[in-house]
Amino acid sequence: MPIDAESEAELRSEAEAPPGGFGKLMRVFTFATAVDRLIQIGCAFAAVCSGAAMPLMALILGRLTANFTDYGSSGDDKSTAEFMKSVQTNALWFVYLFIGKFTLVYLWSFGFTFTASRMLQAMRLTCLDRILDRTVAANDEETPGSLSNTVTSQCNSIQAALSDRLGIMIQAFSMLLASFAVAFSQSWQLTLVMLGLVIITLGLIGFIVSSDQKIEAGLLKRYAECSIIAEDALGSIRTVIAFGAAHKFLAKYNEILKKTETDGKKKGPFVGLMFACQYFFMFVGWAIGFYLGAYLFTKGMISDPGRILSVFFAMLIGLGAIMALGPNMPSFIKAIAAADVAFKILDDGTDQNQDSESQKDASQPEKIACQGHVELRDMSFAYRGREDRNALDKINLSFERGTSTAIVGPSGAGKSTLISLLERWYEPTAGSIFLDGNDIFQLDPKWLRSQIALVQQEPQLFNASIFDNIAYGLIGTEQENLSPEDKQTLVHDACRHARAYEFITKLPESFDTMVGDRASLISGGQKQRIAIARALVARRPILLMDEATSALDNENSKVIEALMTNSIDRTTIFISHKIRAATKADRVVVLDHGKVSEQGTHEELLSAGGLYKRLYDAQTEVESSDDEDPIKTITKTPIPTVVEKTEEASGGPQASIAEPSDNLPQIPKRNLLANLWEIAKEQRRYWPIFLIGLVACVVTAQIFPVQAILLGRVMQVFQGPPEKVSSDANFWSLMFFVVGLGAMISYAILGFFMTLLGVYLTRFYRLEYFRAVLQQPVEFFDRVASGTLLSRLSSDPSNLHELISINMGLLISIFVSVISASIIGLAYSWKFALVAIFAAMPAVFAAGYLRMKLDSSLAEEMEKISEESARFVSDSLSAFRTVKAFTMETAVHHMYNECLVSFAGRLYRQRAVMTLFFAFSESVELLASALGFWYGGKLMGDGELSTEKFFTVFIAVVVGGQAAGALFGFSSNLGKAKIAANNILGIRSQVRAAAARDQSRQMAEENHSEKTENTVVDMQNVTFAYPARPNVPVLKGISFKVYRGQTVGVVGTSGSGKSTLLALLERFYEAQSGTVNVLGRPISAHDIDEYRKRLAIVPQEPQLYNGTVRDNVILGLDEDKVQEADVATACEAAGLGEFISSLPDGFNTQCRGQGVSFSGGQKQRVAIARALIMHPELLLLDEPTSALDAESEQLVRETLGNIQEGRTMILVTHRLNIVRNAHVIIVMDGGRIVEQGTHTELMAKQGNYFKMHESSNGGEA
């Protein structure tokens, strides 16, 4: 299913469009409150002051250097005493700077984290509000996955940048500026030259970052496209699994990832260039600065060499500031691109896209009671992309209060579209709609919808309790603020009217039962009755029902008949394909091809002899079909007509309920190194790239130790005569330039190759992650919400990329640099180095290690928070129409706010502790410097250390300490990467373990060769409970056989276990006890992929995917194996021929927004065609005609008869007329088979089936 050309063009234009830039990121601060801004000002001041602490150290170093130089040339007892006193005094200043910096870093780190959380909480809420305030028409153009990705993942990127990383950036810039201020105070001439080079460097980096950000913005658009594909697949994962279509979604996903790889590789040169420029110009600055400093000294323009060295130390600290900027730049680049995406939603205030903005002056007659008189005048409407064909054409209708109106007509006649327009989801292309004489587009949309109760054809419930789902129907009404007791009374009354009370109270947790993600834990009929109760609970003046009985059995369908005949206090509009329900209405409106064909009472329309009579006669003919027109029986071998009875039905012992035999294992948690080793082992083809990058890492790691040696020699230069100072300065300046060239080349190689490696590995693991998710068993998706999975698919590969790209190269370089610096220190003076290293380094590493542990713990907590947030947002946006219909926007806002507040509280508590170690690791190098100067001075005073050796060791160890601090600066990245690697590699290991178990089971059952006997399905004493509710048995001792060529009907009340039977046959789940043999072998002995190719299913709620109609029909087949004639034949057999001919692009018509412009009947016929084209040996149909009109139902029924040759069918339905000619009918109740036989046999028994039949025929024979 390729992306259509229009979408690809839109994506390309968006990717090429210039991003919003740094200004968009700064706009995030508009979400700060006055308190937040006050805190941020204080934090910024603290960051500025903490940044100034290290440059102030340069002044102390300058004074100490002068002391060391003077002492080195004298060395008498008096100068020794003065020297030691000066060393001790200046060392104390280092301690004072440590205390100050530690306090300041703690304040700004926690403060920025606190305010960033609050700002992004407000931004997330505003973003969600903006999305929920959109019109349905505008929202149809985007998927919930891409929108929820903006609210969660993109906002996560912004929050990460504006938390402590913002403080680090401010501190780094302050350190850089303060370094130059200190340098200027010592020698303005020398500093001015070096400043020019820094400005050139920053200008180049700015240009590179701007170019890199454009690439990053394009990547974000591509990843949003990936989210759309993933949401498409995960939204109806059972259909994807049943048709073996995972590889198609993977192929689409991979196509996008190929483009991200191409774009991502463009980042390599920019990253390499950024680091190359940064370090090259730094060393060129050293070279020029040292040459010029020596010149000024020899000319007498600088008398004190300590001033020159103060400038050099200030520049060294400024270098550290630039180093601190580097690792944080990718986060800000990502945040800028993310802000651009977020503000496109926040700035989308066009009238046609926003409900509230489009009607700022809309009236809200709250004090006027709504009478419920609805009138449509010359109303026409066409869907986007099908403007040449009106879905509704010049409709004139009037609906009076206290009356019920049934709207009937063939599938695609425009019935559901009419409901959408009454809900103000779309705006008519012509004409008007009036409520009590007011144009509804001049009314406040929320007030309008608060007067309307809606039951959709495919009802959407939230992942909450049954009680909460029904109580949501009170939102926006006067009853919303009732006491909990009064609300409970209303909910229970509504459930009784909806015939839901009995099944709800039988559940173990009653009204507190969770319905699961996308209501996966309840049956279709139960879901529909809950939706009806939600519509009835507030007793709104207008009731709209769109195929509200499609999933209900005949007995429960009578609730609608009761509502139709009892409309005294409301206006009831009911859409149905069931003509029988329409007979109870006060008036019937017949739509055909978007026009009102006829209207009147049931009797009037029958007398008129028009379309209504034809529909009525067609349905009557279907219902009255008897054995004179049986479903064709092509099988040549005799077929038994009686299914074996279950032990329970025959009085045998009831099967015991077993615990689930194969729970999903927890994802194993391994340390980061173990995960990296596994990645390295399986990515051998990328070892050459890694090895080149590794060599570059080792080379770059030697830059700073070499710098320490050079600076140590430089300290000696100024102790000689002027003529020697000049010649030595020329030589060492050249050395700095040579080292700069080496740094430029090695960092360019490191940046390019490590970025390239990250791009390749990220694409691989993104695809592998998605593949592993799609290969999970169905029970996995019962436990993990699709919103959570979408969040993980987006965030985990990004977090892993943070480690396995340039950051990994920098980490290796830093680690090696620490070792090299320590070795040099030991080589020059082992005594001094041992104290400096082993007294200072353990403190640095201990603080850093604890920081990493806490950061990892915080990252795990943040992942949970992000997943819960993503699930909530995804649920809300997936049920967008329900949210709009029940005016739940404000309620969703408050629920999400409570969710975020709870998350923030957990974040603050953990962050308060972690920040202590962060502050210590940021400032501990000052303590190390104090110790180093004190002990080094002592050794010099004792004559055990020369000036050159002191400065070489000191600079090596200080730089090593700075490097160690930078190493732990990656702790947040490491913590997130560890979680991401565990998730990605862990879920793959689950797939492999499951595959191994399946293979072992198949090997154990190899002796079960496929039998050619007539038995296709043989279930014996099967017991089953869903893994999510292991103590609630759904099937109890089921035993039956289905023979080749048979059509077996399965009927029963809602929730009796009918659909569960099909789920077991599709191998979505495994029986807890008993045996299931299919196609002549134990079901577990089949290769699961090959097995599913021999089956096809038509689900109760058919799903269309983004792509063409043709793509949707051939979902279960490979593209190269499909003949166009087969597609046409399958569609014709499913009754789609005329509909497809009417589409502007025929089979190539795009199903945008998961087929939002298709009617329920049209979707169902596409699903039937999808099953028929598979030519399955066993065809499973779950309510295949629930959304079809009588003519289409008769057509499908004939189709099923025509295709029966060599095929076995199991048909689950509430419509008894569909199965009356089946070879065997199974009647289920409470998870058991209570009756079985042919229609005639069951009618003669006058048991459950007889009662259901009498009920469906209104007591008529």
Swiss-Prot record:
Consequence of gene disruption: Dicreases the production of 11'-deoxyverticillin A.
One biological process term in Gene Ontology: oligopeptide export from mitochondrion
MF term (GO), any: ATP hydrolysis activity
Pfam family, one: ABC_tran
Record field: transmembrane: 41-61, 92-112, 166-186, 190-210, 270-290, 308-328, 686-706, 734-754, 808-828, 830-850, 913-933, 950-970
Positions that bind ATP: 409-416, 1052-1059
Protein name: ABC-type transmembrane transporter verA
SUPFAM superfamilies, A to Z: ABC transporter transmembrane region (SSF90123), P-loop containing nucleoside triphosphate hydrolases (SSF52540)
Membrane topology term: Multi-pass membrane protein
Gene responsible for this protein: verA
Domain of life where this protein originates: Eukaryota
Species, as recorded: Clonostachys rogersoniana
One Gene Ontology cellular component annotation held by this UniProt entry: mitochondrial inner membrane
Domain ABC transmembrane type-1: 41-334, 691-976
Keyword Nucleotide-binding: yes
